[in-house]
UniProtKB/Swiss-Prot annotation:
Keywords: Cytoplasm, DNA damage, DNA repair, DNA replication, DNA-directed DNA polymerase, Nucleotidyltransferase, Transferase. It comes from Alkalilimnicola ehrlichii (strain ATCC BAA-1101 / DSM 17681 / MLHE-1). This is Error-prone DNA polymerase. One of its GO terms (molecular function) is nucleic acid binding. DNA polymerase involved in damage-induced mutagenesis and translesion synthesis (TLS). It is not the major replicative DNA polymerase. One of its GO terms (cellular component) is cytoplasm. One of its GO terms (biological process) is DNA replication. The keyword Transcription does not apply.
Length: 1025
């Protein structure tokens, strides 16, 4: 007689630090073993449900959705959702439990289950506790004929006695008994990993766990024959009978967007059309261009057909709120392909000036929801988030989750803790690897860290860390993806508290939402928008000139000259090493050149061998040819080279006969082929289609190779155009208002590639007068001050003083506003400043105007005490002793410690005599050095970068008193001198100086760490992946 079984109690790794297998692994294994069904029942969670759902679609396995719930001081239950209403009940219960506990935990009382789960099926998992009788009575009374007793047998010595006890309990309370394995892993081989997770959950070492570990390795998916030897046939049959009652699938979820934004008497479609046309009239008072009018009609018809009008209205409402509050915002990504989004004010890409491909945004054939990403000022985005919560209520709006997974360092740290390694060893072990090392731990790296790779405990740590890699550790919040629903969101998906106060998240991430076709609004943060808005405000205040993104003077030759000279420190998107190297070669002269510049310095075009052909054609070194007029129509604006995702899609349509939906499927496959494969069928279809349309084999193959390159991350043109606008605006501000732009940049930190030290030196090179932090003049923010010639000087703000309390600064500014300070004592009394605040200001040199040099300021601080308001008019004169001023080096160290920069001489200017004796060249010397020369130089390391697309090459920027030096370190050199490369603050480099046109760099040979020369100087680099 065939054996049939459904596993009804199974935890995946989304029961964090309990389950040791991915949902897909459990589904695939259950299907391999011939199970009828599998219930994924993670602890108070459905975070892994969508992944299991997708995996089950690839098999014949019937997937059941449920959750394990431990009642506070009560029984352990497994709740199953047989229908859509039961799913809503389960999600609401999980949401309630999560809302009543700290992040990562849950709490539910018995009475909270009573009457709330009328459609759920339930399994009671007895604990072998003296409370079984009382718990059984409650369970039977509450669940009645929907309740069952779960029987879990794991080849223990008392299995027979346990079976009889559980059957007796079932009989006593007239509940059917059913086999259920309490599964924690898909195969027995995960036992060591599961033990490690248990130790981490209990915050103990494995050695100290004792009986807290599972008593056997049997909590895995077992063969049907193994189960048949353990369980009475009736219990196995009942598992199938119960599974057959559960017909709910996530495919049955239907999502409704809020409709309350639609005025009475209108439909969502009519209201969206009205708003779109009103926006069009603002942009084109003389009437929409025919091309745009046709595009708008086409988009509105498709939006109506897909039922997406409420989604567009919601995004419009959020953007309109931001604009009413003066919060700068701009849509980006594929939504910038939409003329409707432009008319609604969501995006800034003018459809009359750009070539849009709406199918990149919405495709009927794809049948998936559109994705609208809107960037807001990073420091004011919270206002937008809280507006959404107020507008729709927390019961209808929540942020998507992000799954935080184990990466190499965190895996090594947790594995080391579980195995009882001491903290110092764990630090050395984790510090021995970098992100680019991947999963492998090189024994040589361990030796460099002073560890013995042959130590058995260390080897075991590395092995367990390898198993931890990729497992989810916990849920965090998405950067800004909001799900907003017509009804309670907790009936669609459970919600829980985020770590950040005032935030609620759902238990699914963006990939889960996309898989189920659920819409989200991306409310993202962008530091450059904060900077630009601040710069606009400063411009209005200083010059009385009010600008917006739309009316910054366009196509300014001076701006393009500055960009072509790679004078772009601080400019959005084009301040990186790679962009600065490209700018003198591409030499942008128009806005569309900026669109190309943004897109071309990306892994996609680089890997697809598109960059050099484009540059050669732009320079006239290579002819531009098109195999057909149709291809010319797609590629003429990029000189015959496909640079944007939309171009690849259009080529597939015009050259290979793809439908727009098939072209979008190709685009999606491009993005995932390295992870999932799947480009093979598209290759065949593309090559056959192009041959059929008369294109030669070589051209078709070349196009396919370029498409593969886009799998390394190619930009949509619409996204590049959105970013190019911010590139131009920030470049215009830098070109024409360098003081105000630098001021705005400093007030928007942290952001960008460069620290304030580099931004300030760059501003000085542009003729900006920098005035120091001074308690007599500085506000919290940096601010412009009038010079004699009508131009602004830049006064540094108190925000730059490390460790200064904002409330103390506000008190100081308020007291100064009433009348100026006479000395430090009076300031301390009137502003109620504490000794620590005064010491911080003295160390930063901010008391120089009241007390003189740092030592004199320190002396006055020692005699100052914070006062009460009643004494603020009291002034006591006390003579200060004559103290020698600090040496220049002492001031330099204090500047860097308290501010991170100096307005005095650069540190290397002080070291230059010693460096000259060693024949080390400056950045200025190198600027006039010929190509191919062997040179030696040294500089402060200000940033390190190792892009994933660079084949292991590391890029560094060094700085001395005369400028910056771009350093290229090939992979072999980097590995051979790894410690020096990563640790040096002052780096000496010997290598080959390379020059090609205006692009220069030093290819490193030998590296030496000269950081000892800096002593206590606190110099920090900004390091990037």
């Amino acid at each position: 007689m065939p054996i049939d079984y459904a596993e009804l109690h199974c935890l995946s790794c989304f029961s964090f630090l309990r389950g040791a297998s991915q949902p897909a692994e459990l589904v695939q294994r259950a299907a391999e073993l011939g199970y009828r069904a599998l219930a994924l029942t993670d602890a108070c969670s459905v975070a892994g449900a969508v992944r299991a759902h997708q995996a089950a679609k690839e098999t014949d396995l019937h997937l059941i959705h449920g959750s394990e719930i431990r009642i506070h001081q009560g029984p352990l239950l497994v709740l199953l959702a047989p229908c859509r209403r039961a799913w809503a009940e389960l999600c609401a219960l999980i949401s309630l439990g999560r809302s009543q506990a700290r992040k990562g935990d849950y709490r539910l009382e018995r009475e909270q289950l009573e009457g709330t789960l009328p459609h759920c099926l339930a399994l009671w998992v007895p604990d072998d506790a003296p409370h079984d009788a009382e718990q059984g009575r409650w369970f039977a009374r509450h669940f009645g004929d929907r309740g069952h007793v779960a029987v879990a047998l794991h080849h223990g010595p008392d299995d027979e006695a346990r079976l009889q006890r559980l059957l007796a309990l079932a009989d006593r309370f007239r509940l059917p008994a059913v086999a259920a394995g309490g599964v924690l892993m898909h195969r027995r081989g995960r036992r060591a990993l599961q033990d490690t997770l248990s130790a981490l959950r209990h915050r103990r070492t494995l050695a100290a766990m004792g009986t807290a570990l599972e008593c056997s390795g049997e909590r895995h998916l077992r063969s049907l024959h193994s189960l048949a030897r353990l369980y009475p046939p009736a219990l196995l049959r009942r598992s199938v009978h119960l599974a057959d009652q559960c017909r709910f699938s996530l495919d049955k979820l239907r999502y409704e967007y809020p409709a309350e934004l639609v005025p009475a008497g209108e439909t969502p479609a009519s209201y969206l059309r009205r708003l779109t046309l009103e926006g069009a009239r603002r942009h084109w008072p003389q009437g929409m261009p025919d091309k745009v009018a046709h595009q708008v009609d086409h988009e509105l018809a498709l939006i109506a057909e897909m039922g997406y009008e409420p989604f567009f209205l919601t995004v419009h409402d959020v953007v309109a709120f931001a604009r009413r509050r003066g919060i700068l915002c701009q849509g980006r990504g594929s939504s910038a392909n939409s003329a409707v989004c432009f008319c609604l004010g969501i995006t800034a890409v003018d459809p009359a000036r750009q070539s849009l491909l709406f199918e990149r945004f919405i495709s009927k054939e794809r049948g998936e929801p559109p994705d609208i990403d809107v960037d807001f000022e990073h420091e004011r985005r919270e206002e937008v988030i809280q507006y959404i919560y107020r507008k729709y209520g927390r019961h209808r709006a929540a942020l998507a989750a992000t799954v935080i997974r184990y990466r190499p360092r965190s895996a090594l740290r947790d594995a080391g803790r579980a195995l009882g390694l001491d903290a110092a060893t764990i630090d050395r072990l984790a510090g021995s690897i970098q992100w680019w090392d991947g999963k492998r731990v090189d024994p040589e790296r361990l030796r460099e860290a002073g560890l013995n790779p042959d130590d058995p405990r260390l080897a075991r740590t590395v092995a367990i860390a390898g198993q931890l890699l990729g497992l989810p550790r916990h849920l965090s919040q998405h950067v800004g993806g909001f799900v907003i629903s017509e009804g309670p969101i907790s009936e669609l998906v459970p919600t829980e508290n985020a770590a950040m106060a005032g935030r609620t998240i759902i238990q699914w991430d963006k990939d889960d939402l996309e898989a189920l076709g659920l819409l989200k609004v991306d409310v993202l943060a962008l530091g450059m928008l904060s900077c630009i808005r601040r710069a606009f405000d400063l411009l209005a205040g200083f010059r009385g000139r009010r600008l917006t993104l739309a009316d910054v003077p366009a196509e300014d030759p001076a701006v393009y000259r500055m960009i072509s000279d790679a004078d772009t420190m601080g400019v959005f998107q084009i301040e990186s090493r790679a962009q600065m190297a490209m700018l003198p070669r591409l030499r942008p002269q128009t806005f569309y050149d900026l669109v190309i510049e943004v897109a071309i310095v990306r892994p996609g075009p680089i890997q697809g061998d598109m960059v050099h052909p484009y540059l050669r054609r732009r320079e006239g070194l290579e002819p531009v040819d098109y195999p057909s007029e149709a291809v010319r129509g797609v590629l003429a604006r990029t000189l015959g080279v496909p640079i944007f995702q939309e171009q690849v899609m259009q080529l597939a349509v015009v050259a290979a006969g793809f439908t727009p939906g098939e072209a979008d499927a190709l685009r999606r496959a491009m993005a995932a082929w390295k992870r999932k494969g799947g480009l093979g069928p598209f290759r065949d279809k593309l090559l056959k289609g192009m041959r059929r349309n008369g294109y030669c084999e070589d051209y078709a193959e070349r196009l396919f190779r370029q498409i593969q390159g886009f799998g390394e991350y190619g930009f949509p043109e619409s996204h590049a155009a959105s970013f190019a606008l911010l590139v131009y605006v920030s470049a215009w501000l830098k070109c024409h208002e360098p003081a105000l732009f630098t001021c705005a940049l400093l007030n928007s930190q942290p952001m960008g590639f460069y620290a304030p030290a580099q931004l300030l030196r760059d501003a000085e090179r542009h003729g900006v007068e920098i005035r120091p932090v001074d308690v007599r003049h500085s506000d919290w923010d940096c601010s412009p001050e009038h010079r004699g010639d009508g131009e602004p000087a830049l006064r540094l703000g108190l925000r730059l003083v490390r460790g200064l309390n904002r409330r103390a600064a506000d008190r100081l500014i308020a007291a100064r506003g009433r009348r100026p300070f006479r000395d430090v004592q009076e300031m301390a009394r009137r502003a109620a400043l504490h000794r620590r605040d005064l010491e911080t200001l003295a160390h930063a040199g901010a008391l120089r105007g009241l007390a003189g040099h740092r030592r004199a300021a320190w002396w006055q601080v020692l005699g100052a005490e914070a006062g009460l308001p009643v004494f603020e008019d009291l002034h006591i004169e006390e003579a200060a002793p004559a103290l020698d001023a600090p040496a220049e080096g002492e001031d330099l160290v204090a500047d860097y410690t308290s501010l991170g920069f100096t307005l005095g001489r650069h540190p290397l200017a002080l070291l230059r005599p010693q460096l000259r004796r060693r024949r080390l060249l400056t950045a200025a010397d190198l600027a006039s050095t010929g190509h191919g020369r062997l040179v030696r130089t040294a500089g402060l390391v200000i940033n390190r970068q190792r892009p994933g697309s660079a084949g292991g090459v590391t890029f560094l920027t060094l700085e001395d008193e005369t400028g910056q030096i771009n350093l290229v370190v090939w992979k072999a050199t980097a590995e051979a001198q790894r410690r020096t490369l990563l640790a040096a603050r002052l780096l000496m480099v010997s290598g080959i100086w390379e020059r090609k046109g205006a692009v220069t760099h030093l290819v490193a040979g030998r590296l030496e760490d000269w950081s000892d020369w800096l002593g206590a100087l606190d110099v920090r680099s900004r390091d990037f992946h």
